[in-house]
Amino acid sequence: MSGRVLDLFKPFEAYLPEVIAPERPVPYKQKLIWTGVSLLVFLVLGQIPLYGIVSSETSDPLYWLRAMLASNRGTLMELGVSPIITSSMIFQFLQGTQLLQVNMENKQDRELYQIAQKVFAILLTFGQAIVVVLTGNYGKPSDLGLAISLLLIFQLIFASFTVLLLDELLSKGYGLGSGISLFTATNIAEQITWKAFAPTTVNVGRGQEFEGAVIALFHLLAIRKDKKRALVEAFYRENLPNMFQVFSTIGVFLSVLYLQGFRYELPIKSTRTRGQYGSYPIKLFYTSNTPIMLQSALTSNIFLISQILYQRFSTNPLVKLLGVWGTRAGAPAGQQVALSGLSYYIQPPFSVTDALLDPIKTVVYVGFVLGACALFSKTWIEISGTSPRDVAKQFKDQGLTINGKRETNVYKELKKIIPTAAAFGGAVIGALSVGSDLLGTLGSGTSILMATTTIYGYYEVAAKEGGFTKNLVSGFSEMM
């Protein structure tokens, strides 16, 4: 693609909804207010059901993507942040691979790049809204009728436009951090909180039990005469959240928080000012949660395509090779899961017992996740502008060099460290995800990791802008 491709999007500028950037820095307290308001609007949208649905009780084809996309089925947040994330990742890929020439130091190029991203996100919103309705997620289109189908599409588009503007509001400096990260982490945290403290009751065949694991613990201790049996039931009950999952979630959260503090301090010095030294931190999670996001996106899309093909061509041998789908014990209620084929082997086990019963599948799954995360992490540094060559260029532009090394050797030294750190960090975050899935946390391993890294990122932003400098990770490490 030529750089002139961006000029094709210039006519759209006058017609796109836009949040005007603040003329002066927004005070920290006002940022907190705007962030809170944006979050409140998002949460409200996620609780309002779509008007006109005939039925949404079928197996959810987007089940594996919901947490990552901040999506709630059957609500205005059906699409979540999917159009924005998809558009952003595609354009970042095009830019990183030089298929789209963009000079980010040029204001006009930067603005056109943002316009192009927004236009593509809007097109995706229209496309996804139409597909979701016409594929029968809310009932057969013939049963819904033209008027209701159009109304459903309009509701989905309206909600997605609102999320797009909320994200832009925060990203342009009115709030803290990125709206996409905030909404995704909040959606995950909301689901975890609900599973831990839900006051609703469910009939499990032996009577009514509370859905929330913590509330169920106290309820069982109160009504059971045998307290030991009540504790065992509260910690290991099946098909409902249990206390073992609660403690597993807390353990994973603290582990990720602790590992955030692991970094290699690369000694650097200034080539312009004599005697000025410092360090360049290379974190263990050098690419943050991007590897597990990409791995999750890959597997989720394989699952989605496999399910759609199996529904239509269930007798085709090639389709069966990709995945055979159905319900089984231990799986989420009413949700179709892979029973054989490629999809089965890259699908996480539902429990430690499930993993032990099929060791070959477990080994393949673990190898796939660790390998994919390491590969994605190593590839992402080239796309995102954090590769050894990019960092070496930054050093040169800022008049920095590695202490004890010549300026001409900076790239070689960085090439020894950064790709290894990225691949190892990706494998570690993949291992944490696998561990989370095997332990059975309240939510998938991917969602727990995404929420934890995002929350810590927000803590760092708040610490920087709020004027307090206490490092949460170092403080936690001291306690450990």
UniProtKB/Swiss-Prot annotation:
Protein family (similarity comment): Belongs to the SecY/SEC61-alpha family.
UniProt keyword Transmembrane present: yes
Membrane topology: Multi-pass membrane protein
Pfam families in alphabetical order: Plug_translocon, SecY
Organism, as annotated: Kluyveromyces lactis (strain ATCC 8585 / CBS 2359 / DSM 70799 / NBRC 1267 / NRRL Y-1140 / WM37)
Name used for this protein in its record: Protein transport protein SEC61 subunit alpha
Coiled-coil residue windows: none
Highest taxon listed in the record's lineage: Eukaryota
Residue intervals on the Lumenal side: 54-75, 140-145, 267-362, 436-441
Protein location: Endoplasmic reticulum membrane
